[in-house]
Regions:
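Short amphipathic alpha-helical/adjacent loop interface patches that line ligand
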Residues: 98, 142, 164
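Generic protein-terminus/edge-of-domain signal
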Residues: 1-70, 77, 85, 110-112, ...
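Short, Lys/Arg-enriched, Trp-marked, Pro/Gly-tolerant hinge/linker segments that flank
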Residues: 124-135, 149-215
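Ligand-binding loop in jelly-roll beta-barrel domains
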Residues: 76-99, 106-109
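Phosphate/oxyanion-binding loops and surfaces in catalytic or ligand/nucleic-acid-binding neighborhoods
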Residues: 99-103, 117-121, 148, 170, ...
Length: 215
């Protein structure tokens, strides 16, 4: 997977099958590409740092991440990945559609927990580090997912969904223990998304600051 495919996959590439909308990618910066510019998509994404360190930005919150840490990215969140100086970083992308966690229109778990988490009305930590009380348990969910995906024994999809539900249970439980401060300005985020989409559709034309201001 090259950087151009990665940049534009929301518009040009289906990441998952319709039957089981879940997939993973292993990436290395700068071996595979120098970085991932700001973008967003409709899928939920977990960035799991396997080796090294680098920068991950989520809704303009840029942080240095290290081996073992996890970044949770909601659908629609603007995010980017950058190299830290000369350091290398290997990471796993876990990408899946929210529908994977739904059991139907009247699913209480989806309505009461998952949807509020995904739309931002339920505040949770995005950057998951050893400072969190539940970090080891969260990391174990990822390890279990990796194991069953590697073996793919009959019923492995059930195990993936089970681990994802446990992951979000832990994440939501963690959020109840303390107040998560959020400084994102949703209005500016929507503006940024509009500008990025305009540039993508008109990149062959001469663009000015005035053009951007009128969007």
């Amino acid at each position: 997977m090259n950087i151009n495919e990665y940049q534009n996959y929301h518009e040009t590439k289906a990441h998952t099958s319709a039957e089981f909308p879940y997939n993973t990618y292993l990436c290395s910066i700068p071996l595979d590409f120098p970085g991932v510019p700001p973008h967003w998509h409709d899928e939920l994404e977990l960035v799991v740092i396997k080796k090294g360190q680098g920068f991950v930005s989520v809704d303009f919150d840029k942080r240095l991440v290290h081996s073992g840490e996890i970044v949770m990215i909601r659908p629609g969140c603007l995010h980017a990945i950058e190299q830290d100086d000369t350091f290398k970083m290997e990471y796993e992308n876990i990408i899946f559609k929210p529908d994977l966690l739904s059991s139907g229109a009247n699913d209480l778990c989806m309505l009461q927990y998952i949807m509020p988490l995904l739309d931002g009305s339920l505040s949770v930590e995005y950057f998951l580090t050893p400072a969190l009380e539940s970090f080891e348990a969260l990391s174990n969910c990822i390890r279990q997912i990796d194991l069953v995906c590697a073996d793919q024994t009959p019923g492995w999809q059930l195990a993936v969904k089970s681990s994802l539900f446990n992951f979000f249970f832990l994440l939501i439980s963690e959020s109840q223990k303390k107040t998560v401060s959020t400084s994102s300005d949703s209005k500016s985020l929507e503006k940024m998304k509009t500008v990025l989409k305009y540039v993508e559709n008109h990149y062959t034309e001469k663009l000015t600051i005035d053009d951007m201001a009128e969007l």
